Every structure is written in structure tokens, then in C-alpha cells.
Design a protein with these regions (language model features):
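Short amphipathic alpha-helical segments and helix-helix/interface helices
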Residues: 21-25, 195, 336
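Residue-level recognition of short, solvent-exposed, well-ordered loop/turn junctions
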Residues: 208, 343, 369-371
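C-terminal beta-strand-rich structural cap/linker in extracellular carbohydrate-active enzymes
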Residues: 359-391
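Short, loop-centered acidic/histidine patches that primarily coordinate divalent metals
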Residues: 212, 326-329, 351-353, 373, ...
């Protein structure tokens, strides 16, 4: 809403837009359906829409934050956005957590740039306004993901960066020329890390065919006519053959040039246990088996390494927690997980393998050892005899 003040034409937050969205959402609910909205709004406005409008909102708040965490190997801004979302009353279960879509990687950061521009937050060992934080994060994203070191990603007006998830990863890893990529495994590992962040928390998980195939951006000369008007987003919309039906095609039936796929088609990946799709399948199996999508987020605790992120979720059933523990740094981490929600004596096990890893100590913590760009989904169970019968 604040972003629209003083503008001659606007849609996001306009009273007519809000009324129309609420009307559509109400009509869809009456026939047993649900809706989601993808307006880029402040957290406050997302909460307000959730009260009477669309059932779900696209998570434009944490999306640029997790890209920033990967680009800088520092999760401080991501932890700030996650905590602020919870504190302002937006349940992450009501959000659509997405990887790539058809648009740009937004860095408008409306909540900080406009809605709370004068509010003071602790960030990078200083007291900064929301506007200052937005400027800092935007500068980091532009520096790490575009420019001479990553010319395959392009800025899109003042809204964000035209890129694919794979080229966000490539730029974060310092790859300046996509033609020189010879370590697909490292890109795939970081891509899966981002998938784990989005899938291993309450809410809806979304991704695209560009993600599934590991698509790179198109050379800008291949879409010169389309970008002539300034819309650089066409470089991240490469044609791709999801099922491998026509491997010799050079463009789609609509004339969109075919892009380079790092991972291959779905049939190729399903035949390879180490592929992106197979590993994503394992992540989604854990998500479904433990009911993570409908869990309740309790805590985003402080971390022992700036590249770490820990999400604490309460699962259905007494005495069970799920922890999403991620290493956004391209380096090994030997650290600890600590949260007041972790009961001393609780058993910690790996949801993927079932192996027991640790016991929570009296400081509500346990040690973790994480390879670079690695993620874990952990089950924390309190022994039956230790459960409080009055709870």
C-alpha cells in the first residue's frame, strides 16, 4: 500500500483490487475451492488479506531473503524476515514457498523499503532502519548475482533480477561463464538446499519445470526482439523438454529458444538415483510422511555459524518436533543447534535415514556436523516416560 502513495497508477493495495480479490476468494470458497494471491505486499497487508481474502499468499518476503542467504553465505537477513513474519501474525502455513517462477527474483523488499522504512532493527551489529536494510540487501544481491561476474543474469527495471534458480546458484558459487560449468553436482546440491528450505516448512511448496530440468538463462541475443522493450525476464523463460519427447528441437512450438538443461529430462533423472528429481522426491516423501506442510512453526533460533539456518516445527502428535537445519555456506560447519523448545534428553534422529544422531543436552542443544551446502530434516522425540501428563 505504501508503495502506491503518490503514484498516478497502481494496482497492488488499491481498494478496488482488494475488493475484487476478496470477492473472488469468497466465491471460490463457497464452491469448496481455495485461492492464492501473488501481489508483492508488506507482511501486514498479507495478514490483512488472509483475514477475508485469498486463502494463501505468495511468499515474496522470504523469497529474496533465501536468495540473499545463498549469495552471501549469511542467513541473518533470512532469519530476520522469518521472525518478523511470525511476530506480525502471518502463519507460514498460509504462504506459497516457491523456487523459480516466470517472473524475476524480486528485490523490491516492500515491507522494509516502504511499510516499515523508519522502524529500527538490529542488523549486522548495528541499529538500522528498514529502508537501510532494504538498500543493503538489494546492493548485496546486485553485487553477487549480476554484473561482469554474472552477466548471464540481468537486472529487470527496479523490480529485481532476471535469472533461473540454477544461475542464482552459479553466480553465488562465483561462476562467471555458464559454458565452463563442469561441476553440476555442486549446483544441484545448492539447488536442493533451496528446495529443502521451501519444502521443509509449513505451507505450500511450489517449483517450475525450469527447476526440474536445471535450466540456465538464455543468451540475451537469442531473445533480442523480446527484450528490446526492456523486459529482460525473457532470458529466464527458456523452452525446455520436460519429458524428453523431442530432443532435437531447437525451440518451442511458440518459437521460444530452447535453453541448456543441467539435469536432463524427467525420464533421464528418474533412472538416476543421484539426480535432482530423485533427491527432490526423497525430500517430498519426508515432507508428506511427517506432515511438515501442516506443522506449526515455533522458533527460528540464533545459530552458531552465520551460514546456518534452523527452523523448529511442532508436528502433530505429542512430544514430536521437526527441525530443518541448513548450511547456506560453501564450507564445512561444525556447530550446534539450540532452542528453548528442545527438551533436554530428547532423541534426535535423521528423518531421511532413521539413524539416531544425538541427545538434547541440558542447555537445550546438540552438536551438528554439516558438509558445504547441506541440509538436514531432523526428528526430535521426547521419551514417552518424560512427557508431562498435565500438558
Amino acid at each position: 500500500k505504501a508503495a502506491s502513495e503518490g503514484n498516478t497508477a497502481w494496482s497492488e493495495g488499491h481498494p478496488l483490487s482488494e475488493a475484487a480479490n476478496h470477492l473472488i476468494a469468497s466465491m471460490v470458497r463457497k464452491v469448496g475451492g481455495f485461492t492464492f494471491q501473488e501481489l508483492n505486499l508488506t507482511i501486514d497487508d498479507i495478514r490483512q488479506i488472509g483475514e477475508a481474502g485469498a486463502d494463501l499468499s505468495y511468499d515474496f518476503v522470504n523469497r529474496p531473503a533465501y536468495h540473499h542467504a545463498l549469495a552471501t553465505a549469511d542467513t541473518e537477513f533470512l532469519r530476520l524476515t522469518l521472525r518478523t513474519t511470525l511476530e506480525l501474525g502471518v502463519d507460514p502455513a498460509s504462504l506459497v514457498h516457491a523456487l523459480q517462477n516466470h517472473d524475476e527474483l524480486t528485490y523490491e523488499l516492500l515491507h522494509w523499503e516502504n511499510g516499515h522504512r523508519d522502524d529500527i532493527y538490529s542488523y549486522k551489529a548495528a541499529e538500522l532502519t528498514g529502508e537501510q536494510i532494504a538498500a543493503s540487501v538489494r546492493s548485496d544481491l546486485i553485487e553477487h548475482l549480476t554484473g561482469t561476474g554474472a552477466s548471464y543474469n540481468r537486472r529487470f527495471t527496479t523490480n529485481g533480477i532476471a535469472c533461473t534458480t540454477a544461475t542464482v546458484v552459479a553466480a553465488s558459487l562465483g561462476i562467471s561463464d555458464l559454458d565452463t560449468i563442469d561441476d553440476v553436482d555442486l549446483i544441484r546440491r545448492a539447488h536442493l538446499l533451496l528446495a529443502m528450505f521451501n519444502a521443509l516448512q509449513p505451507g505450500v511448496f511450489a517449483l517450475s519445470g525450469w527447476d526440474l530440468c536445471g535450466m540456465l538463462t538464455l543468451p540475451i541475443n537469442d531473445v533480442s526482439e523480446l527484450v528490446a522493450g526492456g523486459d529482460t525476464r525473457w532470458i529466464n523463460r527458456a523452452a525446455h523438454d520436460l519429458m524428453g519427447i523431442n530432443p532435437h528441437a531447437h525451440q518451442s512450438t511458440a518459437g521460444m529458444p530452447r535453453g541448456r538443461s543441467l539435469y536432463g529430462s524427467l525420464p533421464e533423472q528418474l533412472a538416476d538415483e543421484t539426480s535432482f528429481v530423485r533427491q527432490l522426491q526423497a525430500i517430498l516423501k519426508v515432507r508428506a510422511h511427517y506432515g511438515i506442510a501442516t506443522s506449526r512453526q515455533l522458533d527460528i533460533p540464533e545459530v552458531s555459524h552465520r551460514g546456518m539456518l534452523v527452523l523448529v516445527h511442532e508436528l502433530e502428535g505429542e512430544g514430536r518436533l521437526q527441525l530443518t537445519v541448513l548450511n547456506f555456506a560453501n564450507e564445512h560447519i561444525a556447530g550446534s543447534v539450540r532452542s528453548e523448545h528442545l527438551p533436554p534428553g530428547a532423541q534426535v534422529s535423521d528423518m531421511f535415514s532413521g539413524h539416531e544422531l544425538a541427545v538434547v543436552d541440558d542447555l537445550h542443544s546438540f552438536a551438528v556436523d554439516m558438509p558445504p551446502l547441506h541440509g538436514m530434516s531432523l526428528l526430535v522425540e521426547t521419551p514417552v516416560g518424560d512427557l508431562d501428563p498435565s500438558s
